[in-house]
Regions:
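Single conserved hydrophobic/aromatic residue that forms the stacking wall/gate
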Residues: 1-8, 12-13, 188-199
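Flexible hinge/switch segments at interdomain interfaces of large molecular machines
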Residues: 23-32, 159-167
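Aromatic- and acidic-residue-enriched carbohydrate-binding clefts of CAZyme catalytic domains
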Residues: 73-131, 148-181
Length: 199
């Protein structure tokens, strides 16, 4: 792979004055897919952090960035056809801050939390990764882990709600209704990996 080879060569000459000693370097990755995952659905990271993350991936010769963009706790990608996804689905009213169970009630911080990436920011990150020979794989959970979308469009659920953006971790019973054809318009969001605008 060219990208991996360039990273390896750059490491050899980092502290020199751009001369490469005579050498034969054999640097073949053991695995074709060398990826790292980042969950921004539960916790939003700034673009600057994601770029640093991609830089560190490149230094380790990783080639796939698995970007977890949606979750019960937040919808993080701007979809122009569905602006309510970011107006409503990107914000949760608070976040649980303790371990909880049936016997231990949840303790919440009482602080609204959220945000999302604009199409322009996503394109910027995709281009940044591509320059470092890293492919972005956007992830949208289906049919579960979709409370952020259900809070926005309750008619897409099997029960009709009411729903709210998730404030605790774990598994929720509410999911998208697989028989509802309207959910198809939500799942075409892998388009940020293309140069055209996301619709």
């Amino acid at each position: 792979e060219i990208g991996s080879g360039l990273v390896g060569s750059e490491m050899c000459i980092r502290d020199s004055e751009w001369s490469i000693p005579a050498a034969n370097i054999t640097d073949i990755p053991q695995f074709e897919y060398r990826g790292l995952h980042l969950d921004v659905g539960r916790h939003l990271y700034p673009v600057s952090f994601i770029k640093k993350y991609i830089d560190l991936m490149s230094m380790q010769k990783m080639n796939r960035f698995h970007w977890h963009l949606t979750e019960d706790q937040g919808w993080r990608i701007e979809i122009k056809k569905h602006p309510k996804l970011t107006e409503i689905g990107s914000m949760r009213k608070e976040t649980i801050i303790n371990r909880y169970s049936a016997a231990i009630p949840g303790i919440y911080d009482g602080t609204p939390y959220g945000g999302f990436y604009t199409q322009e920011e996503i394109k910027e990150i995709v281009a940044y990764a591509k320059e470092r020979y890293i492919t972005i794989i956007p992830e949208v959970d289906l049919p579960g882990h979709m409370l952020a979308a259900l809070a926005t469009y309750p008619e897409l659920g099997c029960t009709g709600g009411p729903y709210e953006v998730g404030t605790r971790w774990g598994i929720y019973d509410d999911v998208l209704c697989a028989g509802n054809e309207n959910i198809l318009s939500l799942i075409h969001i892998s388009e940020p990996t293309r140069p055209e605008p996301i619709s």
